[in-house]
Each structure stands twice: as C-alpha cells, then as structure tokens.
Amino acid sequence: MLSCNICGETVTSEPDMKAHLIVHMESEIICPFCKLSGVNYDEMCFHIETAHFEQNTLERNFERINTVQYGTSDNKKDNTLQCGMEVNSSILSGCASNHPKNSAQNLTKDSTLKHEGFYSENLTESRKFLKSREKQSSLTEIKGSVYETTYSPPECPFCGKIEEHSEDMETHVKTKHANLLDIPLEDCDQPLYDCPMCGLICTNYHILQEHVDLHLEENSFQQGMDRVQCSGDLQLAHQLQQEEDRKRRSEESRQEIEEFQKLQRQYGLDNSGGYKQQQLRNMEIEVNRGRMPPSEFHRRKADMMESLALGFDDGKTKTSGIIEALHRYYQNAATDVRRVWLSSVVDHFHSSLGDKGWGCGYRNFQMLLSSLLQNDAYNDCLKGMLIPCIPKIQSMIEDAWKEGFDPQGASQLNNRLQGTKAWIGACEVYILLTSLRVKCHIVDFHKSTGPLGTHPRLFEWILNYYSSEGEGSPKVVCTSKPPIYLQHQGHSRTVIGIEEKKNRTLCLLILDPGCPSREMQKLLKQDIEASSLKQLRKSMGNLKHKQYQILAVEGALSLEEKLARRQASQVFTAEKIP
C-alpha cells in the first residue's frame, strides 16, 4: 500500500500512485487549514509546517519514519521509488511531550514559548529537525516518468546522521532518539520537570539541563552585550565630560579675560589715554551736543595745555574758604551740636572732564596738600611748591617708585601712571608724601566693629585725632591738624572735622571730590542753611563699607627717617584696627 504525501490517500500500486500524483500536478493545491492556493507542493509543505504547525500536530497522531520502496521482480534496481523519509510534524510532539491535559488547556494561551502542542524538550534537536524538514523536499526523490530525480540517502531529522538504507535509519532513530519519541500518557507516572526560567515542562532531566544551559548562554550573551553597552556608555559619558570641561575652561578663560579687561578699564590701565586725552574727548562731545561753543573749546584747550606744560593745577575746580564758613556756622547756629572739631584750612577740589570717574585719589591729595601748604610746620619740606595738576602728580609718584618706595605697588601698576587713567589710593599718597618728607601713617579698619556693619572704632580714632582739649574747651575747635585721607572700595574722600551731638553721637564732616563747585559755593554764604551741610555730614550709619583706610599726617620727616621709611616700604604694612 502506498500513501500520498499530499492528501494522505492510500493506493495499491505504483501506477495508481503515479496517476494520482498527476492529478495533483494538474489540479490546484489548496491548504486544508486556511484554503491557501496558487503555490507549488514544496511551498505548501513549508506553509503548513510554519503557519499551521499546531493544527497539523493535533490532527494527526505521531507517525514513525516511513520508508516506502517500490520495485518489480524484473528490474528492482531501476524501478525503485523511494519516498524519502517523511517525518510528520507530529514527531515534534514526542521530542519533549507535555502532559496531555496540560496541552489541551494551554492550546490557545501560550504560543510564544511552548508552542501549544510543540512540547520539545530539546531546543537543539528541534532546530536540527526544522533544518531536516527544509531539506525533506529534496530528499524525496522518485524515479519514473513523473519526476526525473536521483536517490538521496535518508538523514536523521534529529542529529543529521545519514544512513544508506531506511531500515538502518529507523533503527538509529529508535535506539538513539527513543526518548524523543516517547509520548507520555495522561495517566502515566512519568516525572515532569519544569524549567525555572520559562516554565517549559520536560520529561528528561538531562534535556532540561541542556534547555536551561541555553537560557544561561542567552543571558550570558545579553550580559556581554550589556557590558559592551555599559562600556560604550562610560566612554560616551567620558567624552561628554571632557567636552563639558573644555567648554567650562573656555568659558572661564573668556570670563577671566573680560574681567581683566573690565578691571583695566576700571583702574585706567586699558591704554585709552590719560587726563589730556579724556579732557579733549569730553570737550569735543560737549561741542557736538551744542553745550559748548567752539570758541570756548579752543580757549579751554589752550588753558589746559599751558597748565600741563607748567605742571600746576589751573584752580578752576577749587573752592576756598570752607573751614572759615563752617566756623561761623557752628558759632551762630547748629543748636543740636555739642562740640565740633575742624581741621586746618583746606581747599576743595572737584573732578573735571579730564579725570571724571577715576581722579578722586588725585583730587583728595590736592586737598590734603592745600592744607599742608598753608601750615607753617611744613614749609621746609614743601618750600616753594604749588598745587600740581593730575599728570604732574602721576609723574611725582613715578619718581617715588624710582627712588625705591613700594616696589610691589609699582609692579602692580606696571611702574607707569602718566598717560593712563589709573586710580591711586592711600598707599600711593603715602609714598608720595614720604618722598616729600611729610610724616604720615596708614590705619586699616579691615572689618566692621559695630552692629549692622558700622565702624564706631573709626569714628573714635578720628575724634581722638582732632580732640586735644578737655571739657572746658569752646564749642568750635579749629585745630592745626591737617585733613584725613579716607579710602574705601571704589572711592576716596577727605575728612575735615567731626561733630559731637548733644546725644553724644558722632558725625564726620567730609569733602567729596565728586561734589561740584556750585554745591560747595552754597557753604560760602553768610547765612548757611542746615540743609547745605547735608552733603558734608556723614553719620555712623552712612559709612558701612566692609573696609576703610585712613591716612593721617603727623609732621615732617628728617632725611634719615625718610630713608628708613623707604626701606620699610619694601614690604608695605599698615596699622590694623581692630
């Protein structure tokens, strides 16, 4: 009896089979499960094995390897039709069979891993079997008028072994792969083993172990991929960090350059010219805006050039007679003031178009020098001297550096002041006065000594500096003490006296070089209004900068004292309070 591989019909002889096959060749092949048509036999077999694996398995019971030989008594060798091994797809049911009742329940639930009826205990054997099924179409070879093919020896669907005869192959499968062909019955006591990783049920412990090993290999591969991914992530993170660091350094470098240029502009070291260039530039702006006639521009320019050539201040920013006016005011008014101490006579100098924004230190030096020039105690060291203009003051400070005073400060300013808008502070005024043999010293109030950032110790020091008489002294004391140079961050002013209120609070009297002449002229009126003194009076609450420095003049120096102070200025120090 011969069985058709296409439809399963059984015929009795080879001629009937050939005729039956011709019918299949002439008719359209239709899938018995989904009615697919229009494909050849090999494609239909592949379609059924892949798309209808479960249905095909449930519909047919397990069939053993079929080997059919056809032969005649006359010529058995030439007329042999070998329908090579057909391993029904249901053979996969025997690879590692689940319990029947479990397979029936899970048929519609789990098609991803267990394959509902594909109860394989050995994934490796299953893969080999699928390969053998792909080859099956080429292994089935029929000699005759229908197919002109050659005989191909049978191959084991599980391990790939090739035998010469089908009987040998059947024996091989039964002996070597008997465990894969066993189908556990519903009521048998065969032990079942669950995969701890995917839940697959196996009937053989060794097959389960191999199955689990496949899981472990897969996990190991995934871990390796994770490590590669992790290594790539670390490298990417390192590259991103390097790029971020590079951008940060570039940004810091850019900000540093900008800050340095800002400081250069702030302290007048940006090579934009000095007093002369700024004066001319600002006067040109005034002319362009219509605030200054061209004739006035040329007149002022000529006066400036003459002043610079002589090295003396032209006096156009000076206001004299302030101490005298204050003395009259306190004698006749100021009923809330208990006592007041005033410095020696001093002139006020305010900033001009040539030094606006940076010349406060120079103007305060002019105020202090104006007081010293009117004090007989300093005639010897300042004999024949006039108030210098700002470029001349810069030249005098450079000369003091050349003598050896304060080399560190000179280095910070590149040993150059002329032609720049560089600020000067208490240190530069100190070395200039010392080079002129004027005795002075600097006191550094480096932190606040009172509540809310105030400096009561500063007020006490200035009071002690000016006061020298007891309770019996008059209300207004005009001392012979020169004004005090007062420096803080970004600005400097001149202290010309101190008030003591009836409630014992203290108030400094301060001249500001930023105050224009028209405001100072209000103090020279016969009847000074109390509001006019508002620009001079500074209470403790008005002085809240973090640090203050004062420079106080104490007399004249001998030549030996000057040399000693020059040597001491190599490492500049100041008295600190507290």
Curated annotation (Swiss-Prot):
It comes from Homo sapiens (Human). The record marks Q487 as: Involved in the stabilization of negative charge on the oxyanion by the formation of the oxyanion hole. Belongs to the peptidase C78 family. ZUFSP subfamily. It is found in: Cytoplasm; Nucleus. Changing H491A: Loss of catalytic activity. Residues 226-248 are annotated as: MIU. Residues 249-274 are annotated as: zUBD/ZHA. It comes from the Eukaryota. GO terms for molecular function: cysteine-type deubiquitinase activity; zinc ion binding. GO terms for cellular component: cytosol; nucleoplasm. Deubiquitinase with endodeubiquitinase activity that specifically interacts with and cleaves 'Lys-63'-linked long polyubiquitin chains. Shows only weak activity against 'Lys-11' and 'Lys-48'-linked chains. Plays an important role in genome stability pathways, functioning to prevent spontaneous DNA damage and also promote cellular survival in response to exogenous DNA damage. Modulates the ubiquitination status of replication protein A (RPA) complex proteins in response to replication stress. Keywords: Acetylation, Cytoplasm, Hydrolase, Metal-binding, Nucleus, Repeat, Zinc, Zinc-finger. It holds the Pfam family Peptidase_C78. The active site is at C360 (nucleophile), H491 (proton acceptor), D512. The keyword Zinc-finger applies. The modification N6-acetyllysine is found at K262. The motif interacting with ubiquitin (MIU) and ZUFSP ubiquitin-binding domain (zUBD, also called ZUFSP helical arm ZHA) are responsible for binding the distal (outgoing) ubiquitin units S1 and S2 respectively. C2H2-type zinc finger 4 is a ubiquitin-binding zinc finger (UBZ) and required for polyubiquitin binding, possibly binding the proximal ubiqutin, and for catalytic activity. C2H2-type zinc fingers 1-3 are required for localization to sites of DNA damage. Disulfide bonds: none annotated. Its EC number is 3.4.19.12. Changing D406A: Loss of catalytic activity. The lineage of its organism: Eukaryota, Metazoa, Chordata, Craniata, Vertebrata. Interacts with RPA1 and RPA2. This is Zinc finger-containing ubiquitin peptidase 1. A zinc finger (C2H2-type) spans 2-24, 29-52, 154-177, 193-215. Its main location: cytoplasm. Changing D512A: Loss of catalytic activity.
